[in-house]
Amino acid sequence: MSHTEVKLKVPFGNKLLDAVCLVPNKSLTYGVILTHGASGDMNLPHLTSLASHLASHGFFCLRFTCKGLNIVHRIKAYKSVLNYLKTSEYKLAGVFLGGRSMGSRAAASVLCHIEPDDADDFVRGLICISYPLHHPKQQHKLRDEDLFRIKDPVLFVSGSADEMCEKNLLEKVAQKMQAPHKIHWIEKANHSMAVKGRSTNDVFKEINTQILFWIQEITETDKK
């Protein structure tokens, strides 16, 4: 399915966030918000590949840049993007919040802090690519508090050799979550999703396929 790229500026306090939308050439229903990790920007290959894949299957996709290591700042920026889409001209029925590494932490925090009065079903789920559950070699300090408060569906896509998300620890955290959840492991992938002996595009294809399938499952259920 063809789509159109639209560059825009999203209001964030007295600043503007750089963003790019991929808009499918069809009537819109659902969208996905994506942002990068502690480094990089919205043009990270992981994100551009995923956005193109989702848009080619009919899902509106917005990527945005918010640089910096201050997680509170990143969370506020993400919330501004979400609020922008709620009232935008695209008139989406719902969105999925997503991100890579630190970006997925910000998305998770936004979702778990949505006020009851805002629970209008606009946010349909959370996509965590390489969720940074802990610092390398600091498995005793888990970033799991927000995950336990989420009630909407969550998809984790992580590498089985991720130095910031030990496999058995994420599985234990997931078992305690109240939200419906799924974990897809990219075998032998590290935090950057690099796998020795596999091409980057091959890994991207696996990630993109899993995320699209999960989103389609939820949106198809909504139609019933």
UniProtKB/Swiss-Prot annotation:
Transmembrane segments: none
Gene3D superfamilies in alphabetical order: alpha/beta hydrolase (3.40.50.1820)
InterPro entries in the record: AB_hydrolase_fold (IPR029058), KANL3/Tex30_Abhydrolase (IPR046879), NSL3/Tex30 (IPR026555)
PANTHER family for the chain: TESTIS DEVELOPMENT PROTEIN PRTD, TESTIS-EXPRESSED PROTEIN 30
Record protein name field: Testis-expressed protein 30
Species: Bos taurus (Bovine)
Gene responsible for this protein: TEX30
